[in-house]
Structures are given as structure tokens and as C-alpha cells.
From Swiss-Prot:
Chemical reaction(s) catalysed: citrate = D-threo-isocitrate; (2S,3R)-3-hydroxybutane-1,2,3-tricarboxylate = 2-methyl-cis-aconitate + H2O
Organism: Mycobacterium avium
Entry similarity comment: Belongs to the aconitase/IPM isomerase family.
Cofactor remark: Binds 1 [4Fe-4S] cluster per subunit.
Record-given protein name: Aconitate hydratase A
Length: 961
């Protein structure tokens, strides 16, 4: 069949890099231009080609976010996957309609973090070898959309509270991750248009401070900057007016290789902002309030767009924080339009004058500049008066569960009974002398070893003020930390962490000013609190240093532990051994306070049950308090005149931050990003291959060459019907991608663990499936291996088990072992599912592992959209039971032999609407039905005919010469 699509594989320039010539992948195709939208705009002395939105009637009525999508379709119209009808559909968008019209979105660039990015790069490296095996040039495999990978997920706060914590944590980081880092260092030199930012930054902070352009320019064409990323918090860039969100690895790879991302035109929730921020340092409080409002309203799968006169009152850093939290309240994106604040931020962060001028001119020319007086039509409406926002935290297990700080003590007392055992008493002071209550006010100094004051009481206690709540005081003795009493509600982690807040100078300086004021009063953190500081950019370190604030933070124990995600993603590191033992031996329900974005149970630290996102100043305050019961209305201390100082006074004093040390000096950013891709000496010292294909190590348990292209011919073979297939899994409703491909711990005794044991995994241990995503051998064995998965082929058996019908009687077996036996006998596999199959995160290995097990088809009642697309991207056909029917309704129990006919219609250039399924079982009549083929677009049909999206792209690269 003749492929109707224009494939973006042209190269217009070559450059020598490291002694090797590399072709620069550049999009050189042109739009069909059905609306005559192609035009030019002049900015200074330069002229740019643009695609005018006003050439399409009704686009002026659209919300900002949909205007960006409309331009994307207009510029990428190819007459097949993106047609005039698609453009008109978005131009004539009905705000009240549901999300039902599918479009193909072509992001301008891709951003990745190392945890999810490694398997994507493994695929690209494998493609290079495959194209060489087929007689092509390996260097043809290069991103066609610019891609950046930032290493931020690997650093762990193992060491803390000391001046050398950062250096020691970096050393441990390289010991743990040397194998992966060597692979990424090779990538840095081997690919064009793909850059790697070595450790010491967080991807989303780098994105807003450096990578994002707001308006892109490629080959003389100017267009809105858009992106997809392999991390859900990619939405942080929405604060700059850049439309972007998190996707799975398969979609990210497709986008890098010039393929569009399938999506539905969404509903758009207009969020009107009025009033002024209550204080410059209140960004986190605003974010938690917006998160609460959106989660209660219901914004899942929708765009949230901020508008109104209050938008101008929201600083760009605060906008970025709001965008960052989009996944927490469920929206696909949470975007601000472009305005003067955007321009000022671009200047502030050191973007060049030519780029800034292009952004302003383009936005105004295209109707993308925010007009506070104009109210676009939205699907739904929300509103917030910023002046009504109050200091807040959230928790203990969901970021949308906001708690006003004034109510934190009472709410905690309501929550704690559900987190403690039945044996814990309600009268906490029955075990302590009542006088303790007066002995330990909130401003008590702490122990000296972890940034604590020198004058400490005999025994400090987290059980003080425990009256009226469950209490289980436990005395802890430590050579380093002294003697103290732990109890339920003790704050054992206080972490200034995450790009969510560390990208915001006002809240970061607010935390440091609070530290300075408390240290000057002789106050200190409690000895049981693990205090860590992990910013997302070295800019933070530099302005702290310039302002002379580091000594005060360090006096409270907030030493630099690393630049990276750390505590926010669960890399909090272990608690001191004595504290961890006391918690676990006595089943204490302790807490963490962090300036991060997620607080799900078990996420932050295995010893901590209750987690509370808060602003950086509140993190410092809770480190001083040491317990969740101390901050309601008690003073943090007294000023020089002997007056009580309350937390609210600290917050209001931040109005002086208008001229904070960072000022308006863009040199902070130009200096720190001048060598952003160079890395520190440890990075540069990594042994790095110089070949254009990767030198795979046969001993590696982290990075291995996957088998996707083994035996692949230059031309696709005809697709075939499925005969004599067996069911490897019969599943119920709401099976998530985490059920299919877990990211958590590798359970001893399972096929994945056995493989690693046989491979002599080394001192790192089994670790997590998430750490091993670059090794297909581990990930195949982990597919359908979630310990909570219930395969209905068995009664009352959970985990990665099935029945192996290659053996007499179909005995119980691990799914991986049974799949190997089926493969040995050339028996294809199918999976039967219920409603919402593949829901949850867009995890690429849920589709990759399914295909590599030998599954040819998944038949379900309904699919989550991204997973359905990912299955096709891996050559697995998604089929849907007849409307209203389920496997149970059709009498299927998973013991049948399946024949699926009609798939071969795809060889004739058309996609069948249904295929015929016959399920035969000995001793009974066959069940027969017509299943709906969920290949929904011409592009998906092309991918399936080729055996997957990577095979499709590879073959087109070969054809392009």
C-alpha cells in the first residue's frame, strides 16, 4: 500500500561533532495549507514564516490553549492524518460538547528525565543497529523534534545535616548509576538534536528557566513552543504559556521521530483569577487552594486555563508552580496565556533579546496575547479571589486535601486515630509528667549535631501537647543526636525539595529569612527531624550564597544534599537507624513535611505514614516544631524587642522580597546555564564509547539491547489473522498499567528476581522495576507480575500467575514461564479484559511487555486511550467486545482456543470495523462474536501493518535514502 503521509526525515545540514559527521534532523515538510494561512511576520531585521490563525474562521473565539492546538493542526496539515476537517472541527469547537473528536498533535519538542528516558534511548540505540543491519546509515536515526534529557531522578538524600553531605551523596549517586550514566553520556555525543543535562538540576526547572522558548523557530518558520515529556509534571512549563504534558515512553519516542500524538479535543475549564496575592511568598498556598478547587470540581482529562484580571497579579514563578500541580488535580494541562509577565520572565532568565522580541510579536500577531477584558467561551467555569487565600498545608495522603494552617492541629488530631493501632491510648500524658507541657514550648532549641543549638533541655519530646490524641511516647538514645522522645505525629522529615517550589525565589528566600530570624533567636530544629535542602537549580545556591543566608539554613540542618528530585519522588534516603527502629518497633505514625507535589502513602519514605506538602517557609517552621501539633497559634519565638513572632508575621514580612538578592539580574541564569550540558568532573570522567552505535555490555543488568527489530525485513510482511491462540490472562475492570507493568520492588523468587540472581546483580540488590527499565529481560519477566493483579483464570490467587495449557491439566505457572512455553510451540496469546483496560499512567512497558510476552491481541470492554494507542505502537491489536457485552456475558472463562479472522483486510489498504472471533472449548459449543477493531486513525493502521511505530519509522528512514 502506498503510504499517504509525508514523513519528516529530511536533513538540511551536516555538522562535525567529536570527529564524526552527524546529520541534523530538521522538519522540512510543508502544510497542505487548505486555508491559505501561510504568511510572514517581521521581527526586527528578520522575517519568519507563520501560519495565521485568523485565516480560519472562528479561531478568534477559542481559548488560548485551543488556539495553540489549532495552529499545530494548521501547520502540520498533511491531508491524511491531519485534514481540513480536523482544523474546522477545532475552529468550530463546541464548549459544551464532550471530548470525542480525535486529532493528531505534533509537539515541537520532547523533554525527559532519566528514570523514564533511559528505555526510550535504549530503543533509539537499537534502531541504529537495526538500520545498519538493513544496509542503511545508523546516523539517520536522530530526533526530528528537538529532545532534551535531564538527569534528576537518581540522587538520593542518603547523607544529610553535614557540610559534606552534597559531595558524599554525589559520590554514592555515581557508584549506583555509573552504568546508566555511561550510556547517557554516549547518547550526549552520538545523537544530533538530542542533548543531555548531567546531574545537578531538575528537568522541569531547567525547562522553564532555559529550554522553553515560548515561540519556536525552525528553518525560518515561527510557531508556538509545545512539548511532551516523560514525566507527569511536564505541565510546569504551562506557566510560561507553553502547552505541554506528560506522556508514556512510546509516545515520546514517536514525537521525537516526527510522529504525531493522538488525542481528543478536550473540554477546557476556565479558571478566573481575581484580587491580589495575599503575600509574595504565598505561592504554595495558592497552589494548594487551586488543587483543592479543581479536584473537587473534576477536571480529569480536561485543560484548565487561567484568565481574568487577576492573571497579571500572578508572578511567573507562581504560574509555573500552578502548572506543575496539574497532575495532582487531574487536568491534562493547567496553562496561562502569554502576557507582559511572560516577557519579563524571559528577560529575567537570560533569554536573548531577539528571542524575547519574537515571542511578543508572534503572540500579538496571532491573538495569543492575554487580554484581561476578554472572556473566551469555556466548557466550565471556576473562580478564585487570590486575596482570600490563607497559609495552608495538604495531607496526609492526597495533595488535594488542603488544610488551612489555622486548622492544622485540630485536623491532625482528627486524622491520627486512623493511622495508629488500637492499643494506643487517647490520654497521651498518662505516660509523661504533666509538667512536660510547659517545659517544651514550640521554640525549644534542639540537639547540636544536626544543625541544632548548643543549649538543650535534658530530654526533648515529640509527645508534648499530646493531650487528647493517641500517644505512644518512645525514648530514643543516639550517640549523635542525644536522647529524646518520639511519638505519633513527630515530624521526622522536613525537606525543601522539588521544582514545584525551589524554582520560586520568593518562597525559597522566605524559607531562608525564617531560618535567619529563628537562628538569631537561638532556635533550632528538633534532633529527630531529617532536614534536607535539594533545589532544582544551582541558581538557588548562588543567590543564597550572595545573600549570606546559607549559614542560617545550615544552622537548622538544611545543608545542601543534592540537586534533584530527592524526597519529592521518594528518594528521601534512610532515617537514622535509631529513629527508624523506634518507629517500626513501636508502630509509630510519624510525618514528613515537604515542599513537593505528591504525598501518596508510602511514597516519601517507608517509615513515614503521613505526608504533608507545604511551602518552604512552613517546612522550616515544622522542623523547628518537630511535631504536627505545635504551629496552630503558638509563637515561633520573640523578636529583638521581646515581642512574640508568629508564622503569619513571617509571611507578611515577605513583602520586603520585592528587591530580594536575585533582583532583576539575568546574569544569575546566564552564568549557571552557560555550561549546562558540560557537567561536573565526575560526569566528564565517565568512560564513553565514541562509536555511532552503542557497545552493549553482556554483563549489564540495567541496559540491554531489546529484540524489537530482530529479523525485521526492509518491507513489512502482510499482517495475519490469529489462529489457535490461548488466553494468558483473564482480567476484570480497571486494570491499570501498574497492574500490567509494576514499577515497585522486585519480589524475591519471581522470574525477574531469578534472572537477576542468575546474572549476579551485584551489590545494588534487586532494586525496583523502575530502575531496570533499560533491561527488557527484567521488564518482560515483570509484565503482569504485580502482586495485586488478579488473573481470573485462577480462583483466589493474586500475582503474576496463569494456567499453562501446554501442560496436561493447565497447571498454575508464572505468566512469564507459561509464555515461554507457548512461544516454544508457536502458540500466540491473547488477553481478555474488562472496562477501562490500561487506565492509570501512560507506562510504555505495559505495552512493550505485553508484546514481548507473545500477546497478539487484547480484547476488552473498553480501553484507556493512551494504552490503546501504545498497544498498536507495539504491534498488538486492541479489540473491543460487542457493545454492552463482557467476557462473562459471552460465556468465556479463558480456557478456550481463539481464532480471530478479518485482520488481513488491513493488507488491502482498509481498516475493518470488526473482526470475527471464535472461541472454542472441548465439550461445548464455540462462542462466536464480532469484536470492534480499535485502530482509530490511518496512522495507527500504518503502525500496525509495520508491526509497530518504531518499525514504521525505521522503514521510512530506509526509504528516504
Amino acid at each position: 500500500m502506498q503510504d499517504k503521509r509525508t514523513v519528516k526525515v529530511g536533513t538540511v545540514a551536516d555538522t562535525a561533532v567529536g570527529g564524526r559527521t552527524k546529520s541534523l534532523g530538521v522538519e522540512v515538510t510543508d502544510s497542505v495549507n487548505s486555508f491559505g494561512a501561510r504568511n510572514r511576520v517581521k521581527v526586527g531585521d528578520k522575517s519568519y514564516q507563520i501560519y495565521r490563525l485568523d485565516a480560519v474562521p472562528n479561531t478568534e473565539k477559542l481559548p488560548y490553549s485551543l488556539k495553540v492546538l489549532a495552529e499545530n493542526l494548521l501547520r502540520n496539515e498533511d491531508g491524511s492524518n491531519i485534514t481540513k476537517d480536523h482544523i474546522e472541527a477545532i475552529a468550530n469547537w463546541d464548549p459544551k460538547a464532550g471530548a470525542s473528536i480525535e486529532i493528531q498533535y505534533t509537539p515541537a519538542r520532547v523533554v525527559m528525565q532519566d528514570f523514564t528516558g533511559v528505555p526510550c534511548i535504549v530503543d533509539l540505540a537499537t534502531m541504529r543497529e537495526a538500520i545498519a543491519d538493513l544496509g542503511g546509515n545508523p546516523e539517520k536515526v536522530n530526533p526530528l523534534a528537538p529532545a532534551d534529557l535531564v538527569i534528576d531522578h537518581s540522587v538520593i538524600a542518603d547523607l544529610f545535616g553535614t557540610a559534606d553531605a552534597f559531595e558524599r551523596n554525589v559520590e554514592i549517586e555515581y557508584q549506583r548509576n555509573g552504568e546508566r550514566y555511561q550510556f547517557l553520556r554516549w547518547l550526549q555525543g552520538a545523537f544530533s538534536d538530542f542533548k543531555v543535562v548531567p546531574p545537578r538540576r531538575i528537568v522541569h526547572q531547567v525547562n522553564i528557566e532555559y529550554l522553553a522558548r515560548v515561540v519556536m523557530e525552525r528553518v525560518g518558520v515561527a510557531y508556538p513552543d509545545t512539548c511532551v515529556g516523560t514525566d507527569s509534571h511536564t505541565t510546569m512549563v504551562n506557566g510560561l504559556g507553553v502547552l505541554g504534558w506528560g506522556v508514556g515512553g512510546i509516545e515520546a519516542e514517536a514525537a521525537m521521530l516526527g510522529q504525531p500524538v493522538s488525542m481528543l479535543i478536550p473540554r477546557v475549564v476556565g479558571f478566573k483569577l481575581t484580587g491580589e496575592d495575599p503575600a509574595p511568598g504565598a505561592a504554595t498556598d495558592v497552589v494548594l487552594t487551586v488543587t483543592e478547587i479543581c479536584a473537587k470540581h473534576g477536571v480529569v482529562g480536561k485543560f484548565v486555563e487561567f484568565y481574568g484580571e487577576g492573571v497579571a497579579e500572578v508572578p511567573l514563578a507562581n504560574r509555573a508552580t500552578l502548572g506543575n500541580m496539574s497532575p495532582e488535580f487531574g487536568s491534562t494541562a493547567a496553562i496561562f496565556p502569554i502576557d507582559q509577565e511572560t516577557i519579563d520572565y524571559l528577560k529575567f532568565t537570560g533569554r536573548n533579546a531577539e528571542q524575547v522580541a519574537l515571542v511578543e510579536t508572534y503572540a500579538k500577531e496571532q491573538g495569543l496575547w492575554h487580554d484581561p477584558a476578554h472572556e473566551p467561551a469555556f466548557s466550565e467555569y471556576l473562580e478564585l479571589d487570590l486575596s482570600q487565600v490563607v497559609p495552608s498545608i495538604a495531607g496526609p495522603k492526597r495533595p488535594q486535601d488542603r488544610i488551612a494552617l489555622s486548622q492544622a492541629k485540630s485536623v491532625f488530631r482528627e486524622q491520627i486515630p486512623s493511622y495508629v493501632g488500637d492499643g494506643d491510648g487517647q490520654q497521651g500524658y498518662s505516660k509523661l509528667d504533666e509538667v512536660v507541657d510547659e517545659t517544651f514550648p514550640a521554640s525549644d532549641p534542639g540537639a547540636p549535631s544536626n544543625g541544632h543549638a548548643d543549649d538543650l533541655p535534658a530530654v526533648q519530646s515529640a509527645a508534648a501537647h499530646a493531650n487528647g490524641r493517641p500517644s505512644n511516647p518512645v525514648t530514643v538514645r543516639s550517640d549523635e543526636l542525644g536522647e529524646f522522645v518520639l511519638d505519633h505525629g513527630a515530624v521526622v522529615i522536613a525537606a525543601v525539595t522539588s521544582c514545584t517550589n525551589t524554582s520560586n525565589p520568593e518562597v525559597m528566600l522566605g524559607a531562608a529569612l525564617l531560618a535567619r530570624q529563628r537562628v538569631e533567636k537561638g532556635l533550632a530544629s528538633k534532633p529527630w527531624v531529617k532536614t534536607t535542602m535539594a533545589p532544582g537549580s544551582q541558581v538557588v545556591h548562588d543567590y543564597y550564597d550572595k545573600a549570606g543566608l546559607w549559614p542560617y539554613l545550615e544552622k537548622l540542618g538544611f545543608y545542601l544534599v543534592g540537586y534533584g528530585c530527592t524526597t519529592c519522588i521518594g528518594n528521601s534516603g534512610p532515617l537514622p537507624e535509631e529513629i527508624s527502629k523506634a518507629i517500626n518497633d513501636n508502630d509509630l505514625s510519624v510525618t514528613a513535611v515537604l515542599s513537593g507535589n505528591r504525598n501518596f502513602e508510602g511514597r516519601i519514605n517507608p517509615d513515614v505514614k503521613m505526608n504533608y506538602p507545604a511551602s518552604p517557609p512552613l517546612v522550616v517552621a515544622y522542623a523547628l516544631a518537630g511535631t504536627m501539633t505545635r504551629l496552630e497559634k503558638q509563637p515561633l519565638g520573640k523578636d529583638k524587642d521581646g515581642n512574640d513572632v508568629y508564622l503569619k508575621d513571617i509571611c507578611r514580612s515577605q513583602k520586603t522580597l520585592g528587591h530580594h538578592p536575585i533582583g532583576d539580574n539575568s546574569e544569575w541564569f546566564t552564568k549557571n546555564y552557560a555550561d549546562v550540558f558540560k557537567g561536573e568532573q565526575a560526569w566528564r570522567n565517565l568512560p564513553t564509547p565514541t562509536r555511532n552505535t552503542f557497545e552493549w555490555s553482556p554483563d549489564s543488568t540495567y541496559v540491554r539491547k531489546p529484540p524489537y527489530f530482530e529479523g525485521m525485513p526492509a518491507e513489512p510482511e502482510p499482517v495475519a489473522d490469529i489462529s489457535s491462540a490461548r488466553v494468558v490472562a483473564l482480567l476484570g475492570d480497571s486494570v491499570t498499567t501498574d497492574h500490567i507493568s509494576p514499577a515497585g520492588s522486585i519480589k524475591p523468587g519471581t522470574p525477574a528476581a531469578q534472572y537477576l540472581d542468575d546474572a549476579r546483580r551485584g551489590p545494588q540488590g534487586l532494586q525496583l522495576f523502575g530502575c531496570r527499565r533499560g533491561n527488557h529481560e527484567v521488564m518482560i519477566r515483570g509484565t503482569f507480575a504485580n502482586i495485586r493483579l488478579r488473573n481470573l483464570l485462577h480462583d483466589d490467587v493474586a500475582g503474576g500467575y496463569t494456567r499453562d495449557f501446554t501442560q496436561d491439566g493447565g497447571p498454575q505457572a508464572f505468566i512469564y514461564d507459561a509464555a515461554q512455553n507457548y512461544a516454544a510451540q508457536n502458540i500466540p496469546l491473547v488477553v481478555l479484559g474488562g472496562k477501562e483496560y490500561g487506565s492509570g499512567s501512560s507506562r510504555d512497558w505495559a505495552a512493550k511487555g505485553t508484546r514481548l510476552l507473545g500477546v497478539r491481541a487484547v480484547i476488552a470492554e473498553s480501553f484507556e486511550r493512551i494504552h490503546r494507542s501504545n498497544l498498536i505502537g507495539m504491534g498488538v491489536i486492541p479489540l473491543q467486545f460487542p457493545d454492552g457485552k463482557s467476557a462473562k456475558d459471552l460465556g468465556l472463562d479463558g480456557t478456550e482456543v481463539f481464532d480471530i479472522t478479518g485482520i488481513e483486510e488491513l493488507n488491502k489498504g482498509k481498516t475493518p470495523k470488526t473482526v470475527h472471533v471464535k472461541a472454542s472449548k472441548n465439550g461445548s459449543d464455540a462462542a462466536e462474536f464480532d469484536a470492534v477493531v480499535r485502530i482509530d486513525t490511518p496512522g495507527e493502521a500504518d503502525y500496525y501493518r509495520n508491526g509497530g511505530i518504531l518499525q514504521y519509522v525505521l522503514r521510512n528512514m530506509l526509504k528516504s535514502g
